[in-house]
Amino acid sequence: MFPLNFHYEDVLRQDLLLKLNLANVMEVPGLCEIRIVPKTSSTYDFIIKNGKLAMEILRGQKFIQTERGSTGKSFRSNPFLESNKDKGYVSDLARQSILRGHGMSNFLVRILTVMSLLDSRVEIRENSIQFSMETEFCEFSPELEDHFEIFEHIRRFNVTIVTSANTQDETLLLWSGFLQKDEGESFKWKTP
């Protein structure tokens, strides 16, 4: 059975999809990828040392390191990790981790399972949904709880769910169920 079957049957109801008045079913927006970036409260060295392991545990798949240039230095900044040009070198880990395919589906099932229990601010953009998973997310995930010493210095994970939607309204319509809490109230969300 498709891991997100419940999401498509219970959250993405057909009446919502029909409101889009799409001529072709291939035009219905879908999920492209999930981007995950850890934010820490301690030193930059901690990110290099333990961040890789934390990402492997959280994502459920091995972290793949990309090739560096011949100089071994990069001066690109990453606003998610609050890194900047003064630090000189930005490791491959400082760049966001991207999930696609089966790993993405499994991680999304986990997110959808606990999001209604967490108090996260959700931001809907043109073709993406952005939110932060605080450390309280560990309480709902046994493998994170078992390795809490690795996660104790990570303040949160910034998560971006990228869709193939063309407008913010399409994204909001398709993911409106994602914003519902168990008690019937809605998540706090904002537009850019």
From Swiss-Prot:
Mind telling me which Gene3D superfamilies this protein's record contains?
3.30.1440.10
Molecular-function annotations in GO: structural constituent of ribosome
Q: Tell me the organism's taxonomic lineage.
A: Eukaryota, Viridiplantae, Streptophyta, Embryophyta, Tracheophyta
List the subcellular locations.
Mitochondrion
Q: Which organism is it from?
A: Oenothera berteroana (Bertero's evening primrose)
Quote the cellular component terms of the Gene Ontology held in the record. Answer: mitochondrion; ribonucleoprotein complex; ribosome
Q: Which UniProt keywords apply?
A: Mitochondrion, Ribonucleoprotein, Ribosomal protein
Q: What is this protein called?
A: Large ribosomal subunit protein uL5m
Range of residues in the leader sequence:
none
**Record has Cell membrane as a keyword:** no
